[in-house]
Amino acid sequence: MAISKKSSLYLPIFTFITMLLMVVNKVSSSTADANALHFTFNQFSKDQKDLILQGDATTGTDGNLELTRVSSNGSPQGNSVGRALFYAPVHIWESSAVVASFDATFKFLIKSPDSEPADGITFFIANIDSSIPSGSGGRLLGLFPDANIIKNSTTIDFNAAYNADTIVAVELDTYPNTDIGDPNYPHIGIDIKSIRSKKTTRWNIQNGKVGTAHINYNSVGKRLSAIVSYPNSDSATVSYDVDLDNVLPEWVRVGLSATTGLYKETNTILSWSFTSKLKSN
């Protein structure tokens, strides 16, 4: 573990505490300073103190992170929502026209006894005090607040209801909800402050197989990209141009979320890594 600090002789309190927690929980590798963050989880312990677990999320079962509720025999349960956020905040931009680039990778296992699994997994970026919004289960993926919207609501009404001012997410959506703007098939989507994705691409889920999601943000080109793949299969790729300093606060947390609804699936995370560093525009 290496620590570097250029802007001050004193480590921020959150960084110092985070480093101690990493040692205790044996995160395989990590570095942190005021302008960069790196972590890697190759497995998850039962008492994983450097993660903030919300809702039904648990760690330690076979060394994995279970984002949604499972029974004692490992069967997925319906109507469940869970999230896991990394303990240390990320410095995503600063006033001197500097924005962070980042890479995130996680391996996941989605397994469902149903013919149609639901509802999906996301990688998300939110304000540092983010919690699960009320009624955000199922199609809202643990990220966006629920609201009673009539089927033929206007775009203005829709956006006002399904909006979160400080959320950027990549969704691995396993169940199409066309009434909230989903395409009529499972898909990868990029969400900017709304559950209605800015860009989507078809995703062929492989039930019960381990997949890999890789998310990249290039701050120079201002492009957010995601690639989701299974071994020996074609990848699903989606990208969207967004200026994060116009969307997110200066300090954020990164996390993973998942939900189930009437239909269900396991939302198991086997590993997770993240690297960010501030770069000039």
UniProtKB/Swiss-Prot annotation:
Signal peptide region: 1-29
Gene Ontology MF annotations: carbohydrate binding; D-mannose binding; metal ion binding
Annotated a carbohydrate binding sites: 139, 175, 262-263
Site residues by UniProt (Cleavage): 148-149, 163-164
InterPro entries per record: ConA-like_dom_sf, L-lectin, Lectin_LegA_CS, Lectin_legB_Mn/Ca_BS, Legume_lectin_dom, Leguminous_Lectin
Post-translational modification: The mature chain consists of residues 164-281 followed by residues 30-148. Concanavalin A-like lectins of the Diocleinae subtribe undergo proteolytic processing referred to as circular permutation. The propeptide is split into an N-terminal and a C-terminal part, the gamma and beta chain, respectively. These are then religated in beta-gamma order to form the mature alpha chain. The beta and gamma chains can often be detected in cell extracts.
Positions of the propeptide removed during maturation: 149-163
Domain of life: Eukaryota
Binding site for Mn(2+): 171, 173, 182, 187
Binding site for Ca(2+): 119, 173, 175, 177, 182
Pfam families the UniProt entry points to: Lectin_legB (PF00139)
Keywords attached to this entry: Calcium, Lectin, Manganese, Mannose-binding, Metal-binding, Signal
SUPFAM superfamilies, sorted: Concanavalin A-like lectins/glucanases
Family of the protein in this entry: Belongs to the leguminous lectin family.
Note: Binds one manganese (or another transition metal) ion and one calcium ion. The metal ions are essential for the saccharide-binding and cell-agglutinating activities.
PANTHER family, A to Z: CONCANAVALIN A-LIKE LECTIN FAMILY PROTEIN, LEGUME LECTIN DOMAIN-CONTAINING PROTEIN
Subunit description: Equilibrium between homodimer and homotetramer.
Function: D-mannose-specific lectin.
Protein name per Swiss-Prot or TrEMBL: Lectin CaBo
Source organism per UniProt: Canavalia bonariensis
